UniProtKB/Swiss-Prot annotation:
Gene3D superfamilies: Death Domain, Fas. Keywords: Repeat. This is Uncharacterized gene 71 protein. The keyword Metal-binding does not apply. One of its GO terms (biological process) is regulation of apoptotic process. It comes from Saimiriine herpesvirus 2 (strain 11) (SaHV-2).
Length: 167
């Protein structure tokens, strides 16, 4: 997943107002020199400074309620939706659950969770995020609900029963 291509693909369907909102979420402010022409470049430039730009982008899309685009970020295709026997709205619900869990994990939690989950989900995605990894695997070999059950068990194992209840 390439940063520039991903951002341009995602923001292609955004209105100017949504672009400014996205820039504000990523950058924390909207520079005076910013205009509708260079806004994509500013978003890409800001995200390129982050080692986990995919997680940052994922959280912004979640805040903006661009759930269809979140699925896009997870590289969910129409074929993958058909293959998983789930409808788009059902997958969107699972994405919201996963992003919510991701937003509430500490760095320590994430490291411990990675260690446990790697046994079940070898990383077949370039993304560093546990959640991206889990979701991409959901659409491959494992049934989605099995995958969520496994995540729930792992969250309990690392002492995050509070988050396990939300899955």
């Amino acid at each position: 997943m390439d940063l520039k291509t991903t951002v341009l693909h995602i923001t292609d369907s955004f209105t100017d107002e949504e672009m400014y909102c996205l820039l504000f979420l990523i950058n924390g402010c909207i520079p005076r020199s910013c205009n509708a022409v260079n806004i994509s470049d500013l978003i890409i430039e800001t995200l390129s400074k982050s080692t986990q730009w995919d997680i940052c982008l994922m959280q912004c899309l979640y805040v903006l309620r661009k759930i269809g685009l979140l699925l896009n970020l997870f590289q969910v295709t129409k074929e993958a939706v058909k293959q998983s026997f789930f409808t788009q709205p059902q997958l969107e619900t699972h994405v919201l659950t996963l992003v919510n869990v991701n937003n509430n994990l500490t760095a320590k939690d994430e490291k411990r969770l990675c260690f446990i989950l790697d046994q079940f989900f070898p990383r077949n995605v370039a993304a560093p995020s546990v959640i991206l990894c889990v979701f991409s695997n959901m659409l491959c070999e494992m049934h989605v609900l099995e995958c969520l059950c496994q995540l729930k068990k792992c969250l309990k194992q690392i002492g995050r029963s509070d988050l396990a209840k939300t899955v």
